[in-house]
């Protein structure tokens, strides 16, 4: 994205790409995500990598889980990508490749490469290791909440294969943060905050659904009570 584009430009581009109304509580969700990503990718230190891609898709899928109609979720994501000048296809390809590495290759090897404790041979794991080494050795790296979500998602994929406990997972996360020169406490706070946001959205949707059901019952009762 060119740095000359503003947040307002991105918002206008989104509404041009997706002119349909967005349902209730999700309007704010999409607006905040668009602003967050815009500010991130226009930062001069930002570099696209598979963990950003994984984090963005993880965030979007989790935040929009309850959105209806379901078939519009993908259309909204495509509009966001258009507005932010991101490649929808590249995001999915990058995320799918790293999720597959974490799920399909030996979990211990993946976890050691992620923590900088093993040099991978050729193939997919080496590509992951090279990317992480580049981040660890970068003079200027733009950390983001989306990066932390991507990191946590890949760690979760590998953790399932290794049958890790929550305690083990957090210890692994701390090791990876040390290798990548990230503040573990900040990463943990960002992950906890994201989960709290998901809980608030879930509760808000439950309230909206309950109000809708109550209103529908009232309409049905009025219809029954009215003389034919």
From Swiss-Prot:
Alphabetically list the UniProt keywords: Coiled coil
Coiled coil stretches, renumbered: 201-223
Which residue stretches belong to region Disordered?
Answer: 209-228
A Pfam family this chain is assigned to: ThylakoidFormat
> Would you name any one GO CC term?
plasma membrane-derived thylakoid photosystem II
One GO BP annotation of this record: photosystem II assembly
Q: Which domain of life is it from?
A: Bacteria
Keyword Magnesium assigned to the entry: answer is no
The job of this chain, per UniProt, is described as: May be involved in photosynthetic membrane biogenesis.
The family classification in the record reads: Belongs to the THF1 family.
UniProt protein name:
Protein Thf1
Q: What does the record give as the organism's lineage?
A: Bacteria, Bacillati, Cyanobacteriota, Cyanophyceae, Gloeobacterales
